[in-house]
Regions:
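A short acidic, often aromatic-flanked loop/helix-cap motif at beta-alpha or helix-coil junctions
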Residues: 27, 141-145, 229-234
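Positively charged, low-complexity intrinsically disordered leader regions
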Residues: 1-71, 75
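Short glycine-/small-residue-rich Rossmann-like dinucleotide-binding loops
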Residues: 38, 63, 119, 242-244
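Residue-level preference for short coil/turn positions at secondary-structure junctions
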Residues: 15, 53-54, 131, 166, ...
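Glycine-rich phosphate/diphosphate-binding loop of Rossmann-like nucleotide-binding domains
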Residues: 63-76, 157-241
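Phosphate/diphosphate ligand-binding glycine-rich loop within oxidoreductases
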Residues: 45-156
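Conserved beta-strand segments of alpha/beta enzyme cores
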Residues: 18, 83, 134, 193, ...
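Generic structural signal for well-ordered alpha-helical scaffold segments
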Residues: 38-42, 152-160, 184
Length: 244
């Protein structure tokens, strides 16, 4: 794979591409991202990680606590030659003494990328509206795109019988969280089968199911929302979560 040098990577481009939800990406784009992930995973094993982020900084806003997302972003930025800044609400004036719009403007001038884990979609939308650099959604109560990419990558690595993702059915055992919503939409884009299995009161909202089904019409996937636990029997992947 031919990779650009950091000096050739212009993050401050005119047409900024954010990562808000995997539903915004095509299957080809998601495949390309996973190909890069595979390359970088092997490069780390070989102690030869390319310095794609050399001289760059990512400002990480965390309204909510995190273990995996925070650590993975910090480690990734360091391995790629860059720097990650952890910014909690007590560290910056996020919507307090300073508007979210102003925070976004200021961070855009100083950082090359903004990553945000927010307690509301409105906070993320405010950052997106005024940012002049790419914004990555680290979870905003609606979507969790980086988790979805990691999950698909893991599934693909563990299905070793030659089947493609669009030949698989995934069962999600849990309530209608951002993870469930993101999984359903991502599976639908890929043409995978998706089943949410659990008590009716925890089922996904109809408007999101309708959106996923619209993706399935193009991809060939299928969606099932059920309280029948026996429906797990013909699934290839089981994803466990909690019922709150």
């Amino acid at each position: 794979m031919k990779l650009p040098s950091s000096s050739a990577t212009d993050l401050h481009k005119a047409n900024i591409e954010h990562m808000v939800s995997m539903k915004d990406f095509s299957v080809r784009e998601m495949d390309n991202m996973m190909e890069l992930m595979s390359y970088l995973k092997q490069a780390r094993k070989d102690n030869a990680v390319p310095q794609l982020f050399k001289g760059k900084s990512v400002g990480m806003i965390f309204e909510a606590g995190s273990t995996r997302t925070r650590v993975s972003f910090e480690v990734a930025a360091t391995l790629l030659g860059g720097h990650a800044l952890f910014l909690s609400p007590k560290d910056i004036h996020l919507g307090g003494k300073e508007s979210i719009d102003d925070t976004s403007r200021v961070l855009s001038r100083m950082c090359d990328v903004i990553m945000a884990r927010t307690n509301s979609p409105e906070t993320l939308d405010g950052l997106l509206n005024m940012s002049t650099v790419p914004v990555i959604n680290g979870l905003d109560t609606r979507f969790h795109p980086t988790q979805m990419l990691a999950d698909l990558f893991t599934i693909r690595e563990h299905i070793t019988d030659g089947r493609q993702l669009n030949e698989l059915t995934l069962a999600f055992m849990g309530d209608a969280t951002d993870v469930c919503r993101s999984l359903m939409l991502t599976c639908a884009k890929y043409g995978m089968g998706f089943k949410q299995i659990g008590p009716v009161k925890y089922h996904m909202e109809p408007e999101w199911v309708e959106l996923a089904e619209s993706f399935c019409k193009e991809s060939g996937g299928h969606i099932e929302i059920t309280d029948d636990v026996e429906r797990i029997s013909d699934c290839d992947v089981v994803y466990g979560d909690s019922f709150y």
